[in-house]
């Protein structure tokens, strides 16, 4: 397994170009299964999960090519089953189910790897499709969906806010007979992006970005060209990188209006922030950040995917900051690793209490999940000495060429190939 070796401390500053959003690119790739004409999706990041999704679409019979943009022609899809060997590495593959059953009347997806029903809400995807008239069976580790004729529009009230299930229901409803209303829908910018992509293909959707999305079913979707929005979490990660190293950064190809909660907290931490139409600049003027209190919640509140980065910020900030995680359980696995580097924190239930220290020391640490691993790499950039981050395949799932981008900002980082 590959590792990162990081030599610190360094001040991170300069310019970085933000990639397309993984969490919009993936649902958009699967939504292309709904289209009866070729589709071109631009600004798709080069990531492991994207490669896996493209492989899966090919196995279903779609023609998939990448030359800068991703081109998908789903006219000849003739396989309706997403097999375990591809699904086991990526939960996003559940998004194939809605488009398959909506367009072809049948679909099967292996239960995502290590996913017990109820822990991550696959059950919300299932109940949504059932309310649209699909018959669902769980057999031999597969979710099997079928319908005679077309799905039927429905008034769906979601038990809890779920980005993934909102995508599934919205995609399936585009080809359903009649009108579907999703109440308590997720409001994330990536949901808006997928809705806009579907509208480009001919879907009739309104209310995206609010908690009530209305979809009027159409007979078919055509082709089109669409550009994925910039990755707000990658943007936030690089802004934090500059903040904790007391540096200055400009993020290009960014979308500032998707980051209001994060920018507000960075300003509270003492950062000088300016925004343009497609750029964000942050300047710490050489000052140490101040600790901030953060509570994660669904959009437009503070995103859970920025929690680990702000935990790190608090751990090197002036003062004590509280970080409360309300979206996912077990999302503090980076804290013991950061403690190995000299951080001072206590975890009480779903809150981590961060006591800022002047400096961190390099250590051997292990990445546990995507965002936690990014925070460990950033910690290595500002720690004294050498930090080795193990299991970085987590990072490769969500950040495009993170080491190249950090190096351009002044980091001393190298990828060490695993045996």
Curated annotation (Swiss-Prot):
InterPro entries for the chain: Enolpyruvate_Tfrase_dom, Enolpyruvate_Tfrase_sf, MurA_subfamily, RNA3'P_cycl/enolpyr_Trfase_a/b, UDP_GlcNAc_COvinyl_MurA
Cell cycle as UniProt keyword: yes
Protein source organism: Escherichia coli (strain K12 / MC4100 / BW2952)
Protein name, as recorded: UDP-N-acetylglucosamine 1-carboxyvinyltransferase
Encoding gene, per UniProt annotation: murA
Keywords: Cell cycle, Cell division, Cell shape, Cell wall biogenesis/degradation, Cytoplasm, Peptidoglycan synthesis, Pyruvate, Transferase
GO molecular function: UDP-N-acetylglucosamine 1-carboxyvinyltransferase activity
Compartment list: Cytoplasm
Modified residues (2-(S-cysteinyl)pyruvic acid O-phosphothioketal): 115
């Amino acid at each position: 397994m590959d590792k990162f070796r990081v030599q610190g401390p360094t001040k991170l500053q300069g310019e970085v170009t933000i990639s397309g959003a993984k969490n919009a690119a993936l649902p958009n790739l699967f939504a292309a299964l709904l289209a009866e004409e070729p589709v071109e999706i631009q600004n798709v990041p080069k990531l492991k999960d994207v490669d896996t999704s493209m492989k899966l679409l090919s196995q279903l019979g779609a023609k998939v090519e990448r030359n800068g943009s991703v081109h998908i022609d789903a006219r000849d899809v003739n396989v309706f089953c997403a097999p375990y060997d591809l699904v086991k590495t990526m939960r996003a593959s559940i998004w194939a189910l809605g488009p398959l059953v909506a367009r072809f009347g049948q679909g099967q997806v292996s239960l995502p790897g290590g996913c017990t029903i109820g822990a991550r809400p696959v059950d919300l995807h299932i109940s949504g499709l059932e309310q649209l008239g699909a018959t669902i069976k769980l057999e031999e580790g597969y979710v099997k969906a079928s319908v005679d004729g077309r799905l039927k529009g429905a008034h769906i009230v979601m038990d809890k806010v779920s980005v993934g299930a909102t995508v599934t229901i919205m995609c399936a409803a585009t080809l359903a007979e009649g009108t579907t209303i999703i109440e308590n829908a997720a409001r994330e910018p990536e949901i808006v992006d997928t809705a806009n992509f579907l509208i480009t293909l001919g879907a009739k959707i309104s209310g995206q970005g609010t908690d009530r999305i209305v979809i009027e079913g159409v007979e078919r979707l055509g082709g089109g060209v669409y550009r994925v929005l910039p990755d707000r979490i990658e943007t936030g990660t690089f802004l934090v990188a500059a903040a904790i190293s007391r540096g200055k950064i400009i993020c290009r190809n960014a979308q500032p209006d998707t980051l209001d909660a994060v920018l507000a907290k960075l300003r509270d931490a003492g950062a000088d922030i300016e925004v343009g139409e497609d750029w964000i600049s942050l300047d710490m003027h050489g000052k140490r950040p101040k600790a901030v209190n953060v509570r994660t919640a669904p959009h437009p509140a503070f995103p859970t995917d920025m929690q680990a980065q702000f935990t790190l910020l608090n751990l090197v900030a002036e003062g004590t900051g509280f970080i409360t995680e309300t979206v996912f359980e077990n999302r503090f696995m980076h804290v013991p690793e950061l403690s190995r580097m000299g951080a001072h924190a206590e975890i009480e239930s779903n809150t981590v209490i961060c006591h800022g220290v002047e400096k961190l020391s390099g250590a051997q640490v292990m990445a546990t999940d995507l965002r936690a691993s990014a925070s460990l790499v950033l910690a290595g950039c500002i720690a004294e000495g050498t930090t080795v981050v193990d299991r970085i395949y987590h990072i490769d799932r969500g950040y495009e060429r993170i080491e190249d981008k950090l190096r351009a900002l002044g980091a001393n980082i190298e990828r060490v190939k695993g045996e």
